[in-house]
Amino acid sequence: MTVGILALQGDFREHEEMLRRIGAPTLQVRLPKHLQHVERLIIPGGESTTIGKLLAMYGLIDPLRARIRDGMPVWGTCAGAILLAQRIADGRADQPSLRLMDVTARRNAFGSQLESFEVDLPVLGLGDEPLRMVFIRAPVLEDLGRDVTPLAHLDDGRVVAARQGTMLATCFHPELTPDERMHRYFLAM
């Protein structure tokens, strides 16, 4: 099972390294033709506006939507979660995006890069041991649709991980920690 990693901008190399460490073959996805060689896809963190523009520039939006609608598992981390969200709060209405997951992503929910933080929280489906979560200019997920399952909440109740069918969104960066559980969870979806 080859895991595609959208490699237009952002921290795709960190995801690639984590997947290699756990033995999963990877392919950097930059063009629509690359999608035919992958069974699942990670959309990494980075800058959601920039990644969205690059998705449009390289003709990836429609092929990605089609593959995801056909059931290809996809995981968006941070900016990737924003790009998966049907609705984007605090974003531009014309921002290129996939708009597939029935959630609202609130961009930069914690403020600037100076307000970045780490916290240990439980994640549904990962066992009892809390997961180290790294938040960097991170969004939160709001207005979850009926078919969306929240997987992790901050202490104040805000949702920072959710799943809808074969779509997974995390507002934090599991690839920046040594913990493999989120990547293994995605591979098992």
UniProtKB/Swiss-Prot annotation:
UniProt GO BP: glutamine catabolic process; pyridoxal phosphate biosynthetic process; pyridoxine metabolic process
UniProt keyword 4Fe-4S, yes or no: no
Alphabetic keyword roster: Glutamine amidotransferase, Hydrolase, Lyase, Pyridoxal phosphate
InterPro entries in UniProt: Class_I_gatase-like (IPR029062), PdxT/SNO (IPR002161), PdxT/SNO_CS (IPR021196)
Binding site for L-glutamine: 46-48, 107, 136-137
One Gene Ontology molecular-function label: pyridoxal 5'-phosphate synthase (glutamine hydrolysing) activity
EC number of the protein: 4.3.3.6, 3.5.1.2
Catalytic reaction list: aldehydo-D-ribose 5-phosphate + D-glyceraldehyde 3-phosphate + L-glutamine = pyridoxal 5'-phosphate + L-glutamate + phosphate + 3 H2O + H(+); L-glutamine + H2O = L-glutamate + NH4(+)
Residues the record marks as active site: 78, 173, 175
Pfam families: SNO
Function: Catalyzes the hydrolysis of glutamine to glutamate and ammonia as part of the biosynthesis of pyridoxal 5'-phosphate. The resulting ammonia molecule is channeled to the active site of PdxS.
Assembly and oligomerization: In the presence of PdxS, forms a dodecamer of heterodimers. Only shows activity in the heterodimer.
HAMAP family: PdxT
Identification of the protein by name: Pyridoxal 5'-phosphate synthase subunit PdxT
